[in-house]
Amino acid sequence: MLNSRELLLSKYVNTIKKDDNSFRLFHSIHGGLCEVDNEIYKVLNYLKKSRLLTDIYNEFSYIDNSEINDIVNEFFEKGFIIYNGQNEIESYREHEKRRINRIETGEQIKAIQLVVSNKCNYNCKYCFTNSIYSSKEREIYQKHDKNQIMTPENAINYIEKVIEKIIKANNKELSIQFFGGEPLTNWNTIERVLDHYKNEDRLKIDYSIVTNGALITPKISEYLKKYNVPVIMSFDSPNRSHRYTNDGSDSIKNTIKSLEILKENNNYIAFNSVLSRDTFDYFNNDIVDFAQNYNVSEIGILLDLNPSFYKDFNLDDIVNKVIDLYEYGLDNGIIVTGYWHITYQNIIMNKSIDRGYKTCSATGGQLSIEPMGVVFACKGSSGYFGNMNDLEGLLSCENYIKYASRSFINSNNCINCELIGHCSGLCLGAIEKKYGNIMYMDKGACDLYKLLIRRLIEREKNIFRYDIDESK
């Protein structure tokens, strides 16, 4: 087939020149990050105008035809080379339509954020519950007397309803994240859920818990270890804190005490660390050294949810801070990640269009279930879907379909963006609050993501490389 049709380099192929014989390429929709030598780059560049395969043979007569065939076939399979006249964005839109038509089946549910408690023992300066909400439903339910603590019976009931629905949609896995408030203010429910599903064989369940860590005890640590529950602790820096207990004292002593317990039991520990206007001045590599001391495996950098951060701070300064910490972590055996890094991982993949969601499960891939059964997109979102008492109605409601579609549909302003197939943009809660429209593209945040991803690509040391001599 390739012999008889005109071929063309996709307009969605992006090039970053490394040196005179190294070019890094990725596709805005399909990913497939790779490096090519100058000869392969010239072959691909020649296809910026439509050509027959015989045209390529003639233009590059010094390269064996079999090698050219290998090159063309390889990059055709990756989606980098297309047929002349092929409408890639139309194919992308058709893929979106097919997924929208399946949303009501529950297929899009990849995760449950189980808000077991809306109580918290801390009073953090920049907690999003104090600033990000923007819907009447959030105003009603956040402090509702019956929406503070989830009973074990309700938790299991909610999970059962989701499992029964998604296995009919042929989903094989479900992530359950215990969330709050502070989830450990309701340890009883967490313990009951873990025990109830210890022999679950209908699908694979992965757990995690997001906690400030202050209430961790040896028993809790052992239980979380027993059920392979990663402990994601909210922690920004060993030098200074904006996280305070309700009596106004700094939280660092509590953090250290909990980390010592978790280290003793060899729990998997990750930090959620916020890089924001509040933490910018003291956010540095010290957190990696601190993490090493307590066997913390991973640091997730959460970028500021407030869009003004990307206007008020120099983007190069933000990117440099992230890259410095990322590379320092690599050098010291600590994984440094974040939603920004998931975008990068998506670009490394081939044909990544088929995954469940792009970066954050909250952007179309999860149900955030509150204690009394009301459901939102995320604890950090005001997007309200309904109640677990009517899961079928919830999945067919206009708002759920709109949010679930957001996992694979971006703003129309993203059409020509190099990250369109890999990035979900700024946090939904921030977009809701600032713009009142989850399809809005915040330019400041987008400019930061593009700059950060390009820096990661430029500095990556382990990229698959194609050389003309190795294509025989």
From Swiss-Prot:
Keyword field: 4Fe-4S, Iron, Iron-sulfur, Lyase, Metal-binding, S-adenosyl-L-methionine
Listed InterPro entries: Aldolase_TIM, rSAM, Sulphatase_maturase_rSAM
Molecular-function GO term, any one: oxidoreductase activity
Binding residue positions for [4Fe-4S] cluster 2: C414, C417, C423, C446
Keyword Iron: yes
Gene3D superfamilies in alphabetical order: Aldolase class I (3.20.20.70)
Obligatory cofactor(s): [4Fe-4S] cluster
Catalyses which reaction(s): L-isoleucyl-[protein] + AH2 + 2 S-adenosyl-L-methionine = methylcyclopropylglycine-[protein] + 2 5'-deoxyadenosine + 2 L-methionine + A + 2 H(+)
Binding site for [4Fe-4S] cluster 1: C120, C124, C127
Annotated site (May act as a redox switch): Y339
Keyword Iron annotated: yes
The EC number(s) this enzyme carries: 4.1.-.-
Positions contributing to [4Fe-4S] cluster 3 binding: Y339, C360, C378, C427
Domain Radical SAM core span(s) in chain numbering: 106-331
Cofactor remark from the record: Binds 2 auxiliary [4Fe-4S] clusters that are seen in the crystal. One cluster is coordinated by 4 cysteine residues, and the other one by 1 tyrosine and 3 cysteine residues. Most likely binds a third typical [4Fe-4S] cluster in the radical SAM core domain, but density for this cluster is absent in all forms of the TigE crystals.
Pfam family, one: Fer4_12
Purpose of the protein: Radical S-adenosylmethionine (SAM) enzyme that catalyzes the formation of methylcyclopropylglycine (mCPG) residues from isoleucine residues residing in the repeating TIGSVS motif of the precursor peptide TigB. Is thus involved in the maturation of a ribosomally synthesized and post-translationally modified peptide (RiPP).
Family: Belongs to the radical SAM superfamily.
Name under which the protein is recorded: Radical SAM cyclopropyl synthase TigE
Organism listed in the record: Paramaledivibacter caminithermalis (strain DSM 15212 / CIP 107654 / DViRD3) (Clostridium caminithermale)
